[in-house]
């Protein structure tokens, strides 16, 4: 073994199991769903929630922790280092992970960072940036973000270690995990204390029973829990949902405004959203209009994600074209769905997303693309069903069908970029969501043989069994078989 290899392995977190004991506490002791809307729907720069938003949140958190260290420790500090492992190391270059991680160390947060700042960082890779800790100022650069080993028994496929360096050794080290959808955890993590949900549930069956017993919609049950757990008012929660809906609409509109152009990176992929949208408006193709409009909207938001522009995790950045496409189509079609109905749809989407996070995963590095596009499609199907006034059983059937027909989907991003096959997959995910809704509303409810809980368990089982080469490592599939010239 070379000295370089030995040095790399020495920095890697050593674990004897797939998950560390700390993460096992979180994963196995589930209890009821406790996730909140403002934790799930996040606004931030693309192209990846797990590889861009998550790492920026992690390094921002680490920087904030460092500012609270005793003055005598900070006096010995000489700099900051970040080590990326597993999938973060394997595909981080194409996901802009190093830029996101450095931005977090500089005090930038995903919700407020200017994407132009990240673009400038990419254009000037040798640039140094001052960061102040205590009485000291360090100059940081992309060289301080280290792509470490991709192979190992990591606590999570997206593992990072952040270090405050001294002259001879680290002064302070924290191990983190970007667990999907922009959510982060760390060694020793325990879920934050929250209020108690009004309606306790950890499965779709339990959630649906609450709705049916109390003559409520799925959206109403979720809203009641949001109020109880967060301590916020319905008015405050609705204001947040309006913000998310408007951000989704803006992302699609921005993507549709780009008439032509090549997306960043070596693939040289041309944007096509505007072209598909224009054809959808042509009377010659009226019979194709509904599908073409939804597909164009999904392409638009997904292309914005590929540009590193602002998107909304629903549930992830890689799948951020699906839900916005449905929202845009509902608002701008002849239906002209009201914002009140869209809010209800976003709550119904949360119900499905929460359960997938709770009982499976939202990270392609853990579950493949089924965990991203599949979950997004199921959330979108639930949104449509809620907006159209479907009952809880029909809503579940629609979400189940959408998720079922993404099971087994691999994540094999070409060249590590969230473009091929990711962008078109968002279009197919959105169209499948609509198809799932149509089937669910035209079948006899009681004859639907597969329930959502079984499908979510299958999602988790399939992800666990899937070869790691097909889980956001770019080591197989299209990533290996498509030649980039």
Residue ranges and their predicted role:
Residues 41-59, 308-326, 367-377:
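Conserved phosphate/anionic-ligand binding catalytic regions in large, soluble enzymes, centered on
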Residues 12-33, 38, 42, 60-84, ...:
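Non-transmembrane, aqueous-exposed alpha-helical and coiled segments at domain scale
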Residues 50-67, 324-336, 381-389:
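Alpha-helical support elements that line or immediately flank enzyme active sites
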Residues 336-337, 348, 355-427, 440-448:
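Hydrophobic alpha-helical bundle architecture
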Residues 110-282:
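C-terminal regulatory domains involved in ligand/effector binding and gene-expression control
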Residues 208-241, 245, 251, 414-485:
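A structured, mid-to-C-terminal "fold-capping" secondary-structure block
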Residues 98-121, 149, 374, 379-388, ...:
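C-terminal domain-closing interface element
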Residues 234-336, 340-354, 358-364, 368, ...:
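Accessory "access/gating" subregions that flank catalytic or transport cores
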């Amino acid at each position: 073994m070379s000295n370089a290899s030995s040095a790399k392995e020495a920095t890697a977190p050593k674990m004897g199991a797939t998950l560390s004991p700390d993460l096992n506490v979180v994963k196995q002791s589930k209890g009821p769903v406790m996730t909140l809307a403002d934790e799930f729907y996040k606004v931030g720069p693309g192209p990846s929630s797990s590889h861009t938003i998550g790492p920026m949140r992690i390094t921002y958190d680490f920087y904030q922790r460092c500012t609270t260290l005793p003055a005598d420790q900070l006096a010995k500090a000489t700099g900051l280092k970040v080590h990326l492992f597993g999938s973060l190391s394997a595909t981080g270059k194409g996901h802009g992970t190093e830029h996101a991680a450095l931005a977090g160390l500089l005090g930038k947060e995903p919700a407020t960072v200017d994407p132009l700042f990240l673009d400038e960082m990419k254009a000037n890779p040798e640039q140094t940036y001052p960061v102040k800790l205590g009485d000291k100022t360090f100059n940081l650069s992309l060289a301080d973000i280290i792509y470490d080993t991709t192979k190992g028994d990591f606590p999570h496929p997206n593992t990072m270690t952040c270090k405050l360096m001294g002259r001879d050794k680290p002064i302070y080290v924290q191990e983190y995990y970007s667990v999907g959808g922009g959510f982060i955890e760390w060694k020793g993590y325990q879920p934050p204390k929250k209020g108690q949900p009004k309606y306790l549930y950890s499965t779709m069956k339990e959630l649906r029973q609450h709705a049916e017993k109390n003559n409520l919609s799925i959206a109403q049950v979720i809203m009641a829990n949001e109020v109880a757990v967060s301590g916020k008012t319905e008015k405050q929660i609705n204001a947040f949902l309006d913000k998310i809906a408007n951000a989704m609409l803006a992302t699609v509109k921005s993507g549709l405004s780009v008439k032509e152009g090549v997306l960043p990176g070596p693939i040289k992929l041309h944007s096509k959203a505007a072209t598909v949208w224009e054809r959808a408006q042509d009377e010659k193709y009226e019979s194709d209009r509904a599908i073409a409009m939804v597909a164009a909207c999904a392409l638009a938001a997904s292309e914005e994600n590929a540009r590193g522009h602002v998107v909304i995790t629903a549930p992830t950045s890689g799948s951020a074209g699906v839900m916005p496409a449905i929202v845009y189509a509902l608002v701008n079609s002849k239906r002209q769905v009201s914002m009140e109905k869209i809010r209800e749809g976003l709550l119904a989407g949360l119900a499905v997303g929460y359960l997938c996070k709770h009982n499976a995963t939202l990270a392609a590095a853990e579950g493949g693309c089924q965990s991203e596009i599949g979950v997004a499609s199921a959330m979108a199907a639930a949104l449509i069903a809620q907006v159209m006034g479907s009952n809880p059983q029909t809503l579940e059937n629609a979400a189940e069908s959408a998720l079922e027909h993404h099971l087994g989907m691999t994540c094999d991003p070409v060249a590590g970029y969230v473009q091929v096959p990711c962008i078109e997959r968002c279009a197919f995910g959105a169209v499948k969501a609509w198809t799932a809704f149509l089937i669910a509303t035209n079948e006899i409810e009681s004859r639907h043989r597969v329930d959502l809980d079984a499908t979510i368990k299958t999602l988790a089982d399939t992800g666990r069994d899937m070869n790691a080469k097909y889980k956001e490592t770019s080591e197989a599939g299209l990533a290996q078989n498509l030649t980039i010239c």
